[in-house]
Swiss-Prot record:
GO biological process, one term: cristae formation
Organism encoding this protein: Xenopus tropicalis
Alphabetical keyword list: Coiled coil, Disulfide bond, Lipoprotein, Membrane, Mitochondrion, Mitochondrion inner membrane, Myristate
Motif Cx9C motif 1, residue numbers: 209-219
Cell compartment(s), UniProt: Mitochondrion inner membrane
UniProt short sequence motif Cx9C motif 2, positions renumbered to this chain: 230-240
Assembly: Component of the mitochondrial contact site and cristae organizing system (MICOS) complex (also known as MINOS or MitOS complex).
Domain of life, source organism: Eukaryota
Assigned GO CC terms: MICOS complex; mitochondrial inner membrane; mitochondrion
Name listed for the protein in its UniProt record: MICOS complex subunit mic25
Biased composition (Low complexity): 48-64
Chain intervals for the UniProt region annotation (Disordered): 1-89
Chain ranges of the CHCH domain: 206-248
Length: 253
């Protein structure tokens, strides 16, 4: 019952103390079903009352205990047909009433079982639908999460690619600047060296105090033992050199 209809629930019933088919084993009846079963007993009680009144008046017309002499002529006059007694009629009514009650209660029980089965099927269907919906939502969440992660990965890859391009451009620009600086520095160095060489070459000076220098050398060669005799020439030579230096500084200052 419920989710799988192939396996049925075993249901048994029995008589209670009032001989009503209301005791079930295997299923719990709701209060609504019990009330309906109680309502179904009301016509039966009326019929039982009428049957009881019939049995009360029956002994006057049909005595239940008659002697052999009383019953025998009656059977002879009717041609051998036996008339039903009051006790038999009451028992037959009671059995029919019990059977009708059994059928009504059985129909109510079957209706209740069908309702329970329908409710269990609906409950199982709702649970299955909820489970499918939950699984679908979980799948959608996982899919959205995967899409979000993939999008973030693409964004990070694009950012890394952009940074790589930026740093390559910066490195290339720095290399170009360094190369330009080196070229300018080399040109400036060569220009400065060339200018310095030209300035040095242009400054060709004649020897100063050549006459005094020759006189001193001659004096030293002649007075090897008495070089103090050449001291006056040495003083004049120093004065001449000092004057030439002052003149040079004044001209190029």
């Amino acid at each position: 019952m419920g989710g799988s209809e192939s396996t049925g629930r075993k249901v048994s019933f029995g008589m209670d103390e009032e001989e009503r088919v209301r005791v079930l084993r295997g299923v719990r009846l709701s209060d609504e079903v019990v009330n309906r079963m109680k309502d179904s007993d009301l016509p039966s009680k009326d019929q039982s009352t009428s049957a009881a009144s019939g049995t009360a008046s029956a002994p006057a017309a049909f005595p239940s205990k008659a002697g052999p002499s009383a019953s025998h002529p009656a059977s002879t006059s009717t041609g051998g047909a036996h008339k039903p007694t009051a006790a038999g009629v009451g028992q037959q009514y009671a059995e029919e009433d019990l059977y009708r009650r059994y059928e009504r209660e059985q129909a109510i029980i079957q209706e209740e079982l069908a309702r329970l089965a329908k409710r269990e099927r609906e409950s199982a269907h709702e649970k299955l639908s909820a489970s499918i919906l939950l699984e679908k939502n979980s799948t959608n969440q996982e899919r959205r999460k995967a899409e979000h992660l993939a999008k973030e990965l693409e964004q990070k890859e694009a950012e890394l690619q952009r940074l790589n391009t930026f740093y390559r451009e910066q490195l290339s620009s720095i290399e170009k600047k360094n190369l330009e600086i080196y070229r300018l520095t080399a040109e400036q160095y060569h220009t400065a060296a060339t200018n310095a060489e030209l300035r040095v070459r242009q400054r060709s000076y004649d020897p100063v105090c050549m006459n005094l220098q020759a006189d001193i050398l001659k004096c030293y060669s002649e007075n090897k033992q008495e070089r103090l005799n050449c001291s006056n020439l040495a003083k004049e030579y120093r004065k001449c050199v000092s004057a030439a230096q002052k003149n040079l500084l004044f001209n190029h200052g």
